[in-house]
Amino acid sequence: TQAESSAASDVYKRQTIKAADDAYKPGIFTTFAGYEYTSSVDLYDRYLHRNVIFKNTANIPDVIFSRLDSQDPEKLWDWMDGIREEGVESLAIPHNSNISGGSAFSMNDYNGGPVDEVYANKRLRNEPLVEITQAKGTSETHPFLSKNDEWANFEVPTNHPGENVLTNLSGSYVRDAYLRGLTLAKEGISNPFKFGIIGSSDTHVGGGSYTEETHFS
């Protein structure tokens, strides 16, 4: 039931907050409370995942925004703008862009319309970072996109699980996004892809291994 679902969500939220608070060691290990939002349509078609991270654990909304509210990332940004006005600071970090099928850094919005100033500013406010590498490979660039770069094949996925080849490489990689952003800026639209980069493990446990031989996830 809806009541049972809400109760389970509340328990999970409290457990997440407690885990972040318990593990936090200033100057040694920094933790944040957050969750994963997905607007994926199919498994590897518009595979869009974002990690939503809250600035602190003392002021987190009772109900978080999920794909049940909307699969449109702009609606997530609207929600983040709304809670920011109430004093709740957060950011969203797109990850796994390398298997997004070109959707992560598209020149169109989720509904197919062209990127405009409203879209660009909302994205800039809410997504200042993008994940460039993790266990599923790097999202910097691909040999087909950077043909003169002999290192462009570093840790890139060659196919999706269950598929023979990757498709729609343009719009899936960070370097390509930077170029697209500069193109939009040249056309007089704010650059929505002016972001910094992070690396992650995607282990979902805040840990990883030191060597490839003992890698775990």
Where are the language model's segments positioned?
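Single conserved hydrophobic/aromatic residue that forms the stacking wall/gate
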Residues: 1-8, 12
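General beta-strand structural signal in soluble alpha/beta enzymes
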Residues: 32-33, 92-94
